[in-house]
């Protein structure tokens, strides 16, 4: 029996655990976190991080960083030499390189726009923080342990209950607390079950919470790369191609990470292209016209090792004014870190609600978003903040933390903001991945007037940086 | 803003002409403006932002006192021989040359200027797009071949077998009494690659005559223009097809409408883009094979049709 069982040891789950253990009001609760895969690499990272960057990197908003510093206390355990602050985003359009918008945080005196940080750096800092707080009987992390079943003692009526692979007959109890059955054969009963278990959330299915949304039929291809040299400009670059946005985000020194949202066909191509051609392909994607890109893709589709494309890329690059190339575009990419390419299907989803009696959803279990604005993990951080707030208040008032009376204020605070963010990113994605003439025209005009209307931009910078 | 003033001015220019002519100028101006406005929307948005689409009159620059000079200095040339023009100058050139070409079709300078002023950026960019999508098109853009009587070695072509492209071409040149050097240099198009593309289009024009076998008399020229327009989309050709027939005799019109327009539409649409043909490299290839791979049907021989027609006329007169 536990007060809280957290399923999922991703950034959301570990943050929630560390936040609960950091708050004087919730510290006493007995908590168990269950993670299906091994967290060994996360623990190793704390002691001895690998030399090269890992490929899962996120952009953290200053608000999330503040939360980690003040509420969770894990920021001190972040490997600071592996994060990169940046203060400027330059976004531009492949159908018109002059349609560009710049978000310069220094202009509004904000200093930092966002921080690039590896997922594993965040996870390991949370482990570091939990170690500091002391792992006693009230804090348990079970990794390499899968949740194979969740049952509710009160759901005996098969017709009323959304089954989703769950065996309702196994649990027998007088309490209405859900029972979590583990791959180790153990079962744990929880006053409150929190699903930090990602997009396919078993907890959400157990609770019968509907999640709406759609697949974008798009993949995010990620990779770690090296630039020609360290760019002191600290700019996050994003170019909207008709196949989806391509972003180069700075890491420390000459390192950088990319997210290339692409059609299924293109994403496959990007993964199989010769690793020595790949950097040039990114350079092409950031600068050349769509017609050239299409031609180059078709060459590589026939032969992913066709080094003749380098010649094509060089030739078309030579058509761009050198000065403009230096000022208006990222530095050339020169190297792909071995085996750092991977792709993830992109989708939009939002759960109708985040709570049910004795159940709460946090992070990707509650919502998934297009990565073009780098908000997914940040939304999870704000979820954690609101959920801990709600639990603190419930405890203050002497309420049962598993009751919807306590949990409802979490939904009320977290849901609307997330919903707006999901909507905005969805529209952005749709507007920018079209080559339908009138929309292209409008977006060209729109992006430019946006760039000129300083007040609107200031607002957007504030929104992006979570202020 | 400018659109209205351009049309206004065109009105003044054509008041002296008859209504048919006015119709043409207005249609043409609207077509040109239309393609200017809708074909490449986004680039246009940039131009708009940079103020390139606005009529840079005194009023405008007066409101921005410090930059007034910047607006009046001419941009730098992008390639040797380039004469950078403002958009409104191009529009004037278009209006002037279209009126000129109509009233004086024999004067080449009007035709040439009309060509360049209608080959506005969006159209050339469409051609560029076609070329960049094709391996041979890209090769041409890279190597930038130029066609002159020396680069083509006409003497050598005369010695090729009859069924080769080279021999067909030189035979056509000799028959029509023209030379590859009669083509004028491009000078008003702003981007150097686009300027080359237009130059290339001009230089290849005679090959279109040669492979179709159409002579440069007015009906032949019109047919080739329609064919070209369908195949490549250079508006000059489309305009030519629109207004030129107005000046023809009835029998000429009939031949055009019944035989050559249908042929030009069909062949022009169905054949592969001719701009991507590297003529210099296929001079020794078989012309029928080439027509087959390109999907071009040969039209009936225009000169023969005319001969037959005149023969019939004579016979008719004899009988009477
Ligand atoms: C290409 C790409 C780029 C992105 N870029 C950004 C960015 O720049 N900024 C940003 O903020 N976000 C970004 N995101 C989003 C961000 O990565 C996610 O929002 C975040 O990782 C979600 O964390 P989470 O802990 O909620 O879920 P997850 O990381 O998915 O964690 C869920 C965990 O639950 C475990 N689990 C699931 N089922 C079970 C079970 N039955 N038993 C036991 N354990 C289970 C899983 O093993 C997993 O560890 C990006 C996403 C993608 C795909």
UniProtKB/Swiss-Prot annotation, chain B:
GO terms for biological process: ubiquinone biosynthetic process. Belongs to the COQ4 family. The gene is COQ4. Pfam families: Coq4. Its cofactor is Zn(2+). This is Ubiquinone biosynthesis protein COQ4, mitochondrial. It catalyses: a 4-hydroxy-3-methoxy-5-(all-trans-polyprenyl)benzoate + H(+) = a 2-methoxy-6-(all-trans-polyprenyl)phenol + CO2. The keyword Iron does not apply. Its main location: mitochondrion. The keyword Transit peptide applies. GO terms for cellular component: extrinsic component of mitochondrial inner membrane. Pathway: Cofactor biosynthesis; ubiquinone biosynthesis. Component of a multi-subunit COQ enzyme complex, composed of at least COQ3, COQ4, COQ5, COQ6, COQ7 and COQ9. Residues 1-31 form a transit peptide. Keywords: Lyase, Membrane, Metal-binding, Mitochondrion, Mitochondrion inner membrane, Transit peptide, Ubiquinone biosynthesis, Zinc.
């Amino acid at each position: 029996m536990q007060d809280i069982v957290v399923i999922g040891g991703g950034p959301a789950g570990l943050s929630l655990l560390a936040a609960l253990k950091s708050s004087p009001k919730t510290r006493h609760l007995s908590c168990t976190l269950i993670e299906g895969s091994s967290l060994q690499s996360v623990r190793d990272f704390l002691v001895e991080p690998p030399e090269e960057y890992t490929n899962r990197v996120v952009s953290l908003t200053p608000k999330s960083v503040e939360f980690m510093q003040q509420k969770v206390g894990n920021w001190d355990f972040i490997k600071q030499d592996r994060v990169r602050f940046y203060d400027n985003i330059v976004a531009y359009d492949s159908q018109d390189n002059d349609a560009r918008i710049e978000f310069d945080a220094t202009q509004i005196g904000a200093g930092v726009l966002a921080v690039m940080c590896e997922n594993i750096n965040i996870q390991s800092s949370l482990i570091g923080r939990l170690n500091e707080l002391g792992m006693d009987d009230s804090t348990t992390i079970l990794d390499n342990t899968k949740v194979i079943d969740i049952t509710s003692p009160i759901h005996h009526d098969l017709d009323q209950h959304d089954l989703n692979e769950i065996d309702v007959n196994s649990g027998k109890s007088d309490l209405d607390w859900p029972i979590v059955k583990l791959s180790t054969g153990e079962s744990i009963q929880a006053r409150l079950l929190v699903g930090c278990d990602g997009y396919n959330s078993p907890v959400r299915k157990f609770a019968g919470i509907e999640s709406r949304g759609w697949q974008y039929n798009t993949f995010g291809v990620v990779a770690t790369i090296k630039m020609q040299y360290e760019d002191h400009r600290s700019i996050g670059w994003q170019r909207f191609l008709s196949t989806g946005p391509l972003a180069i985000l700075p890491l420390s020194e000459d390192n950088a990470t990319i997210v290339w949202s692409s059609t299924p066909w293109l994403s496959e191509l990007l993964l199989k292209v010769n690793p020595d051609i790949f950097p040039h392909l990114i350079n092409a994607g950031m600068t050349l016209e769509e017609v050239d890109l299409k031609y180059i893709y078709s060459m590589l589709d026939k032969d992913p090792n066709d080094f003749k494309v380098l010649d094509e890329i060089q030739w078309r690059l030579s058509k761009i004014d050198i000065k403009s190339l230096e000022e208006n575009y990222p530095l050339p990419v020169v190297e792909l870190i071995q085996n750092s390419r991977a792709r993830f299907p992109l989708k939009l989803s939002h759960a109708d609600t985040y709570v049910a009696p004795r159940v709460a959803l946090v992070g990707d279990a509650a919502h998934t978003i297009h990565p073009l604005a780098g908000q997914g993990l940040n939304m999870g951080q704000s979820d954690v903040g609101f959920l801990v707030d709600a639990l603190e208040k419930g405890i203050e008032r002497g309420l049962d933390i598993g009751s919807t009376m306590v949990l409802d204020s979490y939904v009320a605070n977290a849901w609307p903001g997330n919903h707006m963010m999901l909507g905005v990113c969805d529209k952005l994605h749709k507007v920018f991945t079209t080559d339908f003439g009138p929309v292209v025209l409008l977006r060209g005009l729109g992006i430019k007037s946006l760039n000129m209307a300083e007040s609107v931009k200031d607002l957007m910078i504030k929104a992006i940086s979570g202020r | 803003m400018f659109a209205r003033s351009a049309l206004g001015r065109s009105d003044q220019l054509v008041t002296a002409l008859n209504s048919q002519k006015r119709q043409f100028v207005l249609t043409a101006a609207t077509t040109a403006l239309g393609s200017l406005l809708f074909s490449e929307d986004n680039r246009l948005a940039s131009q708009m932002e940079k103020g390139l689409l606005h009529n840079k009159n005194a009023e405008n620059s007066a409101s921005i006192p410090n930059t007034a000079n910047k607006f009046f200095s001419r941009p730098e040339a992008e390639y040797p021989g380039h004469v950078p023009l403002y958009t409104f100058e191009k529009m004037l050139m278009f209006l002037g040359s279209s009126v000129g070409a109509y009233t004086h079709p024999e004067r080449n300078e009007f035709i040439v200027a009309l060509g360049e002023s209608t080959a506005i950026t969006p159209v050339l960019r469409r051609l560029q797009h076609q070329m960049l999508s094709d391996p041979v098109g890209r090769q041409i853009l890279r190597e930038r071949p130029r066609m002159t009587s020396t680069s083509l070695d006409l003497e050598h072509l005369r010695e090729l077998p009859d069924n080769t492209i080279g021999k067909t071409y030189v035979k056509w040149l000799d028959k029509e009494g023209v030379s590859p050097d009669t083509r004028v240099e491009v000078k008003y198009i702003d981007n150097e690659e686009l300027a080359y593309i237009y130059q290339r289009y001009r230089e290849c024009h005679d090959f279109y005559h040669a492979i179709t076998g159409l002579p440069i008399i007015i009906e032949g020229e019109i047919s080739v223009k329609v064919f070209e327009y369908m195949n490549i989309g250079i508006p000059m050709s489309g305009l030519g097809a629109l207004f030129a027939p107005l000046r023809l005799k009835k029998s000429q019109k009939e031949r055009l409408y019944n035989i050559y327009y249908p042929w030009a539409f069909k062949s022009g649409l169905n054949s592969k883009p001719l701009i991507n043909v590297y003529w210099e490299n296929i001079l020794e290839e078989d012309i029928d094979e080439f027509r087959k791979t390109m999907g071009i049907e040969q039209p009936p021989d225009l000169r023969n049709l005319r001969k037959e027609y005149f023969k019939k006329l004579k016979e008719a007169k004899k009988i009477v």
